[in-house]
From Swiss-Prot:
One of its GO terms (cellular component) is endoplasmic reticulum membrane. Keywords: Acetylation, Coiled coil, Endoplasmic reticulum, Membrane, Phosphoprotein, Transmembrane, Transmembrane helix. This is Vesicle-associated protein 1-3. It is a single-pass type IV membrane protein. Belongs to the VAMP-associated protein (VAP) (TC 9.B.17) family. The modification N-acetylthreonine is found at residue 2. May play a role in vesicle trafficking. Residues 6-127 form the MSP domain.
Length: 239
């Protein structure tokens, strides 16, 4: 806790859980230590484009507290060794009773004669978003190789399951392909047989038609021969 004559500020450092491409927030609390005076505050930072402070100005009533939320914008790169040089400055000054947050102006924090301004500097600290799990006190070094073997066995089992699943999926697809090929082969064989059957029926029909035509010519020839015989017989009788 940072303590002055007018306010207490907690915490003394702004700790942000750091994770790439994600926003992160933390808060600080300002408590008015006085019992009779209103205190105005203003929060500034060395990197205003990187942080958003809500509220960045305000008035704290006697004995009251105010929470300030600081949001760090999503970062594309991690700083070297997770060290941050950004800092925040909290300025406080006594204001008259009835002063509202909208009436807090930058000129109020100018250090003029007779005006007491308290400054508090807070540094920024990055902490891992997901800190490593602590090792139980009862664990021994001799157990670590066994744990590693268990991890390897678990990874191997998982890999085997993935390979088996992939093989089964491939086998199912192969079975479907062979079934489709077999079906197409049967359809092709059936179509060939139908074609041969139609060809035989057409050949038989052609032969029957040819026979009928031959029979018709023979009958006509016999009629002509008979008629010719009658004519010749008639002529012979006349002679």
């Amino acid at each position: 806790m940072t303590t002055g004559d007018l306010v207490n500020i907690h915490p003394t450092e702004l700790k942000f859980p750091f994770e790439l491409k994600k926003q992160s927030s933390c808060s600080m609390q300002l408590t008015n230590k006085t019992t009779t005076q209103c205190v105005a505050f203003k929060v500034k930072t060395t990197n205003p484009r990187k942080y958003c402070v809500r509220p960045n100005t305000g008035v704290v009533l006697p004995g009251d507290s105010c929470n300030v939320t600081v949001t760090m914008q999503a970062q594309k790169e991690a700083p070297l060794d997770m060290q941050c040089k950004d800092k925040f400055l909290v300025q406080t000054v006594v204001v008259s009773d009835g002063t509202t947050s909208k009436e807090v102006l930058a000129e109020m924090f100018n250090k003029e004669a007779g005006r007491v301004i308290e400054d508090f500097k807070l540094r920024v600290v990055y902490i891992p978003a997901n800190p490593p799990s602590p090792v139980p006190e009862g664990s021994e070094e001799g157990n670590s190789p066994m744990a590693s073997l268990n991890d390897i066995a678990s990874q191997s089992a998982s890999l085997f399951d993935d390979v088996s699943r992939t093989f089964e999926e491939t086998s199912e697809k192969s079975s479907e392909a062979w079934s489709m090929i077999s079906k197409l082969t049967e359809e092709k064989t059936s179509a060939t047989q139908q074609s041969q059957k139609l060809r035989l029926e057409l050949e038989m029909l052609r032969k029957e038609t040819s026979k009928k035509q031959s029979g018709g010519h023979s009958l006509l020839l016999m009629l002509l021969v008979g008629l010719l015989g009658c004519v010749i017989g008639y002529l012979l009788n006349r002679i």
